[in-house]
Amino acid sequence: METDKYVFFHGANKNQAGVHIFSQWFPVNFKEYLNGEEFAEYVSAEQYMMAHKALLFGDMFHFKKIMECSKQCKIKYLGRRVRNFNPTIWDKHKFDIVTEGNRLKFSQNPDLMKRLLETGNKTIVEASPSDKIWGIGLTAQQAVNIPENKWPGKNLLGKVLMKIREENQQ
């Protein structure tokens, strides 16, 4: 759903507005390089996030399981099982991890970058009623009737996407 001020998205199922591409679960391949060498290939930004969560906490077992998986719900499940998880440490790193994953996703897929840039200066909003961290904790239909400063969620994913958009606007 799109308004004059907002671009709302939720879920990776294809829709006419093309906003499903903003979802962490949207299936798209992209690669990560370290020192000029290919380090890993991902099937979604969700896989990147959960793999880097496992790396952050030194859990190579779950890192390998996450990298072997292509089903988004299973990737999320495995990410929630990362050993040695510390929420304070995760909170310090999660925004940067998700930003870098999405930066790779959009920079390596020009059609996705084009759609991101087409949002102009609108506020990009993950309208997930069940997510108050990455989303706003409301549906799009609920959000349009509530002032933005009253939304219960942080919309971190929307902020990530707007940061990447700003980096690429001319």
Swiss-Prot record:
Its EC number is 3.2.2.-. Keywords: Glycosidase, Hydrolase. SUPFAM superfamilies: YbiA-like. It is an enzyme of class 3 (hydrolase). Pfam families: NADAR (PF08719). GO terms for molecular function: hydrolase activity, acting on glycosyl bonds. Belongs to the YbiA family. This is N-glycosidase R617.
